[in-house]
Each structure stands twice: as structure tokens, then as C-alpha cells.
């Protein structure tokens, strides 16, 4: 497949070469490709422009200024990242008919997966794209994992290529996670959205964004820039940030579909925890629906309502959407039930790695806990240090037993990270070795207790001093449950 340079940027060029591919990775460049020379956080793509031309690049996309005398057309843009996303979308040229995106500090992965499951239940071939990779579902077939878990939002060129591939596979409905990094870096600017959703907004990623204001602006960009006028914004009305997101949506010409206890589109009238999940009573379009949701936690009730709202915004019947909620399965590592303890009790694994995430999961499990609530958690190295004491305080306050352990210390001293957490966690236990911490927690379990191992979720490694050691919280917890007396 080839396109002219003018086709990618929708404007004429004095020299209009044939373009055979689009990338921002100079290692992928081959004859006839457009290389996007983008400045990054670690390397500057402009430093690789000359090498890209030597490898056969037919044109270069770059920010304003510099890069003279390369011998190929240089397309300059005040917003080169956005231009790259739009050029990649123009090159690949296809996408599923119905694309929805969801942003928020927590819940994106679950909402995207729930949307995929609902769309499939209603007869569509659907996909989700995000932290858990790209998953394709169709009625009567096992799920297909196209790409492994990784970044929430891949590079804009990879997004465009994958979305075109999904369209070629017959996928008609796609749900995307829109991380603040991905939105800020213009990775999904080329996707034509039918609707966008918002879950919640709390402290995270300040190491990247620098301030809560910049972090909020990145999230808001999904609505004030990327979602077109006339589309629907599905917003969690129970979030303190709801007014900001509603204002951005209305200003951009979108209609607001609010969900939650304060919602107008889908109103949660009641929620009752049960051993198997929770019973929900939801009002939609004046009709009251009684649902048995097979998922634990108030936050999951919130997530499923955002997902249901996005599916309704995509044109599905509200009654059928709500009925489909009764068949949902939680995302891997998202309040995932692992099994029962040898002396009773239930063990869960969750991705919670922020103060709000940890608080949400502990508060979610408390109503399901007749005995002790046991939490195993830590905090990542080389990341926002301010959240460490916050997580310690939350763990000590909301769990009956808090065990502080290592969670990707990276280049930092693991003991110093644990110390920062423990300083705000009176009574917490310290077990640095994560495997030993999980086994100690399982040994404490008895009938009526609930254990949650928080931090990694679906991740498959423990990062220590630059080395990724294989580690799977679900597998480790399962082994501890099965072999604690061995």
C-alpha cells in the first residue's frame, strides 16, 4: 500500500513523493517511508533524521525550525505529534465504524473490556485496546489476544495500523483506553470517535505531567479536542471532577450522558454487596432495572455504568445493554478473584498502585468481608514519591492487616521506599520479598477473611535495579493458596 505525501497532509507539495510507510521509530524506516522526527522525553527524533534519509526515507515530518539540506521534503508542523497521528490515520485509511474511548485515573482498562464484552453480547465483532493489549471478541468464539499487555496507548502510528487491521478483520466496534500520556502525546488524535467516557480523576502521573492542572488538562483534551461536536460524552456524575468534564464536553458541542448515583442517563438507585458480586437497581429512560452484577466493589458498579453508557451512546438499546452487564467478567488483575484460602477466606489480585486505587479496592472489598481484610502492597521506584505515605496511611487505616512489600523498586533502594510507606502506616508489617509477603498473608487467612494483593494486577515482572524478574501476582497467590501447608 502506498499514498502520496499530499494525501497524508491534505495539502500540495512541490515535491510529492510516494509514501510506503509511516513511523516515528527510525529503526523501522526503509525505502519510501515518512519518518516523524519527534522530540521525546529521552531522545530527540530530529537527531535521527539524517540517518532515516540514508535508510531511504522519502520525507521527514518535524517541528518548526532546523533540519535543512536533507535532500527530501521536510514537512513542518507547530504540533508535529498531532500531524503524525493524522498522517498515520490517513495512510492506513480504515477504522471500525464505531470507536469509543475512555479516560480517567482508574477504571479505563475495566471499562474498555466491559464495552468489548457488551458489544459482543449484542452480536457485534468487537475489540478493546489498552493496558491489556488488543483483544478481539465475536459471538460464539474464544477471545483473540492480538497483542500482549503493554502500554495503555501505543504510538500513534501503531494505533493507526492496528485500527486498520481490526477493520480488515471485520471488527465493527472498538473501545480504546485513552491514558493522559497518550492523549497528551497525541497518540489517538487520528481516531474518529463516536463517543468518549470519563471514570474519575485523582492524583497520579505527576512525575510526567508536573502538576494536577497539567494532568487534568491532558484528560480534558479527550473532550475539548478529540471528541467531535454532536458526539456523546459519558461522564461519571459521582466524581468531583464531573463539572469540569461536563463543561468541556458542552463547550465542544457534545451531549452529556451522566451515570452514577447522581447520573441522569443511567441512575444507580441502589447497590447491595453479595458473596457472588452485587445487586444493582438502575434507572434508564424512566424504566427501573434490577441487575445481578457478578463483580465485587462499588468502583466496578461505577465502571460498568460508564461502559453501559458508552455502548448506549454507540447506538445500542439501553435495556439490552443493561441485561448484558449480568454476564461481564472482570479484566485480568482488576479485583480478580484468585481462589479460597486453605482455612477459608477469599483472595483477590488488583492493579491498584495509586492512593485512590488502593482506597477504592479496600473500600470495595470491605462489604464482602465478614472477618479480617488483609492487604499486601508497595509503591514503585522512580515514580511519584508523594504517594508513598498516602498509600501507607490508606493501607493502615482501611485494612485490618497491612503488609508492606516491594513493587517494582527500579533503581531506588527498596528499603527506603518501604520506609516512606511505613512512616505513615502504624501497625503495618514489613516483608520486602513479595513472594514471602504473599505467603505470609495467605497463612493469616481464615473463614470470612478477604486478602487483596495490590499493585501489579496483570503485570508479569518485578523490576529491580533495571532487571525485570518474572513475577505474576495471580500465579504467586494461587500457589500460596494451594501450597501454604505443604
Swiss-Prot record:
- Superkingdom as given in the UniProt entry: Bacteria
Needed cofactors, names only, are: Mg(2+)
One Gene Ontology MF term:
magnesium ion binding
Enzyme Commission number: 6.3.2.13
On this chain, the residues bearing N6-carboxylysine are: 219
Please provide the record's keywords in A-Z order.
ATP-binding, Cell cycle, Cell division, Cell shape, Cell wall biogenesis/degradation, Cytoplasm, Ligase, Magnesium, Nucleotide-binding, Peptidoglycan synthesis
Q: Hey, which pathway is this one from?
A: Cell wall biogenesis; peptidoglycan biosynthesis
GO terms classed as biological process: cell division; cell wall organization; peptidoglycan biosynthetic process; regulation of cell shape
Record localization: Cytoplasm
Locus of motif Meso-diaminopimelate recognition motif: 407-410
Q: Which reaction does it catalyse?
A: UDP-N-acetyl-alpha-D-muramoyl-L-alanyl-D-glutamate + meso-2,6-diaminopimelate + ATP = UDP-N-acetyl-alpha-D-muramoyl-L-alanyl-gamma-D-glutamyl-meso-2,6-diaminopimelate + ADP + phosphate + H(+)
EC class: ligase
The entry marks the following residues as binding UDP-N-acetyl-alpha-D-muramoyl-L-alanyl-D-glutamate, namely 26, 152-153, 179, 185, 187
Describe its function: Catalyzes the addition of meso-diaminopimelic acid to the nucleotide precursor UDP-N-acetylmuramoyl-L-alanyl-D-glutamate (UMAG) in the biosynthesis of bacterial cell-wall peptidoglycan.
Entry similarity comment:
Belongs to the MurCDEF family. MurE subfamily.
Protein name stated in the entry: UDP-N-acetylmuramoyl-L-alanyl-D-glutamate--2,6-diaminopimelate ligase
Organism annotation: Caulobacter vibrioides (strain ATCC 19089 / CIP 103742 / CB 15)
